[in-house]
Swiss-Prot record:
Signal peptide: none annotated. This is Photosystem II reaction center protein I. Pfam families: PsbI. Its main location: plastid. Belongs to the PsbI family. The gene is psbI. The keyword Mitochondrion does not apply. The chain crosses the membrane at residues 6-25. It is a single-pass membrane protein. NCBIfam families: PRK02655.1 (NF002735). It comes from Rhodomonas salina.
């Protein structure tokens, strides 16, 4: 049961991190004022 909880938490954390990184990257690319990310 403890192992299952660890796996679930790891998966959720990874998913949230990827979603946040993707959202920030897309938001920065849509913003014409951010030329330093190229």
């Amino acid at each position: 049961m403890f192992t299952l909880k660890i796996v679930v938490y790891t998966t959720v954390t990874l998913f949230v991190s990827l979603f946040t990184f993707g959202f920030l990257s897309n938001d920065a690319s849509r913003n014409p004022n951010r030329k330093d990310l190229e």
